[in-house]
């Protein structure tokens, strides 16, 4: 599943662009240059049919598309995706991208039955859903592989300390979210950034799927709050623990409990708040 690109751009954007700005400090105005995170419309096309247009940072798009397909339940496993093509239109009046996925017929038929057309605002996970009845609020139970029993007491503190070093785009722009994959000691093994927190998680999940990693043998550390969609995505792929820097929502806590997933928020080097698993 190697992405192919249009003739317009041979290398993916790095996720930030430099722009001239006027900076006011202490009453003095100065001209300077600053970096801002890129935000592009990215169309996700399944078997030739456009299913979603998400607003995201145009890098790691293959991983993003695979993660979206898995975490939204469009496909059950990575092998259900037969081919994938990333097309970048960097020189268009509105820079945008398309990701074409060829999925097995069973998955495509189920997708058409869902009649779901998303028009995402910066990675919004339920934009465009046609009715409340279509909300997926009954997660599968996360398998108990013994990972939580192996989790080091200082794993969350260690991950909180290490995350900034994996946020190159955030350091450059000050405005992106990060999703990191951590082992039982809290060491960060992979991290992805995006203007949308859901997109960052999808990129991480897609990367894990593409590398055939065991998604039950680690935890996710997020730079954002814990919303229902993020917890639901993690539960779908069997991730046993979601840790976030900011607050959880009430529905995120309910979904975590229903899935048997441990949800921990307000994570700092000095402590955290555990919302339980049952």
UniProtKB/Swiss-Prot annotation:
Keyword Ligase recorded: no
GO CC annotations on file: cytoplasm
Protein origin, superkingdom: Bacteria
Subcellular location per the Swiss-Prot or TrEMBL entry: Cytoplasm
A Pfam family reported for this protein in Swiss-Prot or TrEMBL: FdhD-NarQ
A GO molecular function held by the record: sulfur carrier activity
Key words, A-Z: Cytoplasm, Molybdenum cofactor biosynthesis
GO-annotated biological processes: Mo-molybdopterin cofactor biosynthetic process
Annotated InterPro entries: Cytidine_deaminase-like, FdhD
Principal location listed in the UniProt entry: cytoplasm
Keyword ATP-binding: no
Active site: 124 (cysteine persulfide intermediate)
Known role: Required for formate dehydrogenase (FDH) activity. Acts as a sulfur carrier protein that transfers sulfur from IscS to the molybdenum cofactor prior to its insertion into FDH.
Recorded family membership: Belongs to the FdhD family.
Protein name: Sulfur carrier protein FdhD
Organism, as annotated: Burkholderia cenocepacia (strain ATCC BAA-245 / DSM 16553 / LMG 16656 / NCTC 13227 / J2315 / CF5610)
């Amino acid at each position: 599943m190697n992405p192919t690109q249009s003739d317009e751009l041979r290398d993916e954007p790095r996720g930030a662009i430099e722009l001239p700005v006027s900076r006011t400090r202490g009453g003095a105005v100065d001209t300077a240059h600053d970096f801002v995170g890129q935000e592009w419309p990215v169309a996700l096309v399944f078997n030739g049919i456009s299913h979603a247009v998400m607003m995201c940072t145009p890098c790691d798009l293959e991983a993003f598309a695979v993660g979206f397909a898995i975490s939204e339940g469009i496909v059950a496993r990575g092998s259900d995706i037969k081919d994938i093509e990333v097309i970048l239109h960097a020189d268009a009046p509105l820079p945008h991208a398309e990701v074409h996925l060829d999925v097995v017929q069973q998955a495509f038929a189920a997708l058409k039955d869902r009649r779901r057309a998303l028009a995402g605002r910066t990675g919004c996970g339920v934009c465009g859903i046609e009715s409340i009845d279509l909300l997926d609020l009954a997660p599968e139970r996360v398998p108990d592989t013994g990972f939580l029993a192996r989790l080091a007491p200082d794993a969350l503190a260690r991950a909180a300390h290490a995350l900034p070093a994996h946020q190159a785009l955030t350091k450059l722009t000050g405005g992106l979210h990060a999703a990191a994959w951590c082992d039982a000691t809290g060491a960060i093994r992979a991290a992805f950034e995006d203007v949308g927190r859901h997109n960052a998680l999808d990129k991480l999940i897609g990367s894990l799927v593409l590398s055939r990693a065991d998604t039950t043998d680690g935890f996710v550390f997020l730079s954002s709050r814990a919303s229902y969609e993020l917890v639901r995505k993690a539960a779908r792929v069997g991730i046993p623990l979601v840790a976030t820097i900011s607050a959880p929502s009430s529905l995120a806590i309910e979904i975590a409990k229903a899935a048997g997933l441990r949800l921990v928020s307000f994570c700092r080097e000095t402590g955290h708040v555990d919302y339980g698993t049952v």
